[in-house]
Amino acid sequence: MKILASDFDETIYYLDDPEKNKMNCEAIRNFVANGNIFCIITGRNYTDLKQLLIANNIPYSYLICEDGAKIFNNMDYCLDTVLLDENDIKQIVQIIEEYNWDYYLDDGYNHTNNYNDCVKIVINCIDEDDKRKTVDIIKQRTNVHIYASRTHVNIIHRSVNKKHALQKLINLEKLDYNNLYVIGDNDNDYEMLKSFNGAVMKRHNPILNELGKKEYESLKDYIEELMNN
């Protein structure tokens, strides 16, 4: 039995490539049908992700959402949550309002106004220079985990990343580290790719080059290789 933890966007799912989506989803179904464990690990919240999983008929053993702040089993029971500190939220919101940035708080399922039940702050931002400036400003004034994705700047608790979430999952569910493989394409995949056996998508963030991981054209190709070895 093998355990595969895969990033979602631009690894499993592509907005602009339905044919690749179809091939990846078929490969995932085959992987799970053969008794393997499949975990999706993503920056998306549970609600957004679940809608796409249903629409594309994607099976899973575990979901790790919000970059590791929420962990679910295949019954959608939440195994673990890491909230942002209320004081951190207040400090960050103050900075955001100083600069008049567009943002929302996320509780892991939906937008929220509750500072006591927030796992992520999301700042809407598309321009690359603006994203870098936003990250730098917040890094200088707070102690949180912050990174830029394609259309957002994402802020989570300082202890949260995909690597730590996978370590938690393995301990909670008594899984075998030696059977774990990971795959991703972006900088929020860096820690898990550095720590576990795995691969990167051919189209990936250049920051992952230093890890020296084998590149794959599609998730389907990687799954087929795992199943044949």
Language model features with spans:
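Non-catalytic pre-domain segments flanking phosphatase-related domains
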Residues: 1-6, 26, 172-175
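The start of beta-strands in P-loop NTPase/AAA+ ATPase cores
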Residues: 2-4, 61, 180
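Asp-based phosphoryl-transfer active-site loop
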Residues: 2-18, 193
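Conserved Rossmann-like nucleotide-cofactor binding loop
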Residues: 11, 46, 188
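Active-site phosphate-binding/coordination module
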Residues: 15, 19-109
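Hydrophobic/aromatic beta-strand patches that form the interior of the parallel beta-sheet core
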Residues: 39, 64, 181-183, 199, ...
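Conserved acidic, metal-coordinating active-site core of Asp-based
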Residues: 95-195, 203, 210
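Asp-based, Mg2+/Mn2+-dependent phosphohydrolase catalytic module
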Residues: 176, 195-229
